[in-house]
Amino acid sequence: SRGLGDVYKRQEDNYFKEILNQINQKAFIESPSYKLYGDKKIKIDIDQAPPFESLSNYGASSGSVVFILSNLSLKYVHNSGEFFVETDELRFYPDLNIILGEHGKIDFSFESVYINTNQVILDNFSIDLKNGKIISNSSKLISKDYKPILGVFSYDPFEQDQSFTQFVFQSNSSNNEFVINKFLKLKAGVYIDGNTLSTSSKKRDQSELIFILENDKEIVLRSKSFSLINNQILSNNTQFSFIEENDSLYHPSLELKYNINTNQIQLFNLEGSLKNTPFYSTFFEVEIISDYLYYTPGQRIMNLGIMIAPDQRPVEVKSTKYYSDRIMNELTDLNGINILKATYNFVMKNRRLDFFIDDLSYALKTNSDLIRGGIIDLWRDGFISFDPLSGFVKVLPKTRHYFLSHLKRSDYDEYSFNSISPSSKNIIYDIELRSMFFNGVEKITLSNKNKMEVFPRLGKVELRRDRNLKLIGDISVGNFDFIGVDLLFDYNSYKLDLIEIDTLKMIASKDLIDNYNYLYNIGGDLLINNPRNKSSLKLLPNYPYFVSDKSTKVFFSMPEDYGPEYDSSFYFSIDQFRIDSLDKSTLPKFEFPGTFYSNNIFNPLEAKLITMPDNSFGFDLALEEK
């Protein structure tokens, strides 16, 4: 291309002649790709402080020739069309091959379901005549429905590959609000590149997609850049929060697909650095590893589950106070550095919870690349938040919990369960009831040390606030099996409210025809451990124990085994009772006061039902005393 300052030197006699000849032709620049014209009268001056200072042979500032044009309509012709820059004042520096302008305007038409623009105002701008680029670092995008958006504007003639003029505009920040409908608003940056629209800003702050739900609930999706394509909003790195009162269901990074027409939110936990990272719930106080979350705003049901190999991979649920030596040991690398211990010791020594990864590597006298994988593992497991670009780390409360639990200086729990659903319908979350309904739960571990496991009937479990559970199922603890139990688990008191028990089965002896003792149709409380000793770090000998709250019957035999005379009227009636140390390997010695009924063979006999030498139930009573 041939610009006005490309070939001219001050020392040449024809310097001004050539410049004036070019201006008389009304062309600032001509090239095969673009042309720039102006048709106003020109004032010629010497700028003693040009934008790029010109020096004489003696090193002193010699100023620069400047051509000043006012109220100019600058015509820009390129291969895909043409546009005009209306400007109050334009300063042309032929020696520098640059044009500076103020108060410029360009027609900027962009239409979408999110924003419709018609003009960009350039408070100041520059045109590089060597490449034809227009740049404005102080501009305002004017739309039909919203207030002006502050940002930066650019045009590059060599980036034009469409049949229309491709401008680029990026807002300074993400504080621009757009109302999509009465339930949905977007607080976002604006980035327009040709015919594409996204929400990244120069500041790189997060944009927010906010869904207003009933009863003061809301869903907030945050991303540094949402792609706004037709009726879809997409992002590969979206922070998700479902907020109700002071509680939330949260995930730090998911893939988002939202369709405005169907009004369905689809979130996927399958790709990226944080794939398979848990959802965190402050209401339920659990972590949930799920492949997806689907929700249609306005409805009461959210769905979560497994998409890939759903008949083999489970949804995993753990208490936020869960601790495992296995997980702790897996955080030790081949050099013997346990990254969690190193991180916690570092922040305690420096008395602050944030740092850069290079600070930690320096303290450990190692290369930051060697500990980066461990830092990402901590990030993925919810021990820290981490910015991979800057290396900034912020330590979260889970790190302290694990560190102190490992040292046996803090209580913890072993509360966990899995859900496997071949149909991928693992969790139905009713946001009105504030309950999660699980399918495909084989067992629930409440305490490994106390040998406390619950087996839901048909795999169905209802999760309520603060890890509380409701279900019908069986309980296994030591030599005791509670069969067909309608139960509630209360996490804070760490007990099972056994509302109705079909059968309490107690192993007696393998040498008997029936090696179990049975209690039928009972209820009561099963206390797993002291609420301050969920980890069973302290040895409390009576736990776990069961306290009945209603009478029951012990049938000494069964008519199908011993004949019709031994029917259901041949039994021992027990009032309320208590059984301690359910998890021990041997049965305790029972003494249950009650009444023996013998189908009218004897009058009712008051006695104590005890554990006999063969571990079966019986009583010893001298009848002649009656």
Where in the sequence are the language-model features?
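Short, small-residue-biased leader/transition segments that mark boundaries at the very start
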Residues: 3-8
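Short amphipathic alpha-helical interface segments
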Residues: 329-364
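Accessory beta->alpha helical hairpin/"wing" motif in late/C-terminal subdomains of nucleic-acid enzymes
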Residues: 388-408
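A short, conserved structural fragment
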Residues: 379-390
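Beta-strand-dominated lipid-handling architectures at cellular/organellar boundaries
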Residues: 31-280, 284-312, 409-512, 569-626
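Short amphipathic alpha-helical interaction segments
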Residues: 365-380
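Short acidic/glycine-rich loops and adjacent helix/strand connectors
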Residues: 323-327, 391-394
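Extended, regular secondary-structure scaffolds
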Residues: 141-144, 148-151, 156, 327-334, ...
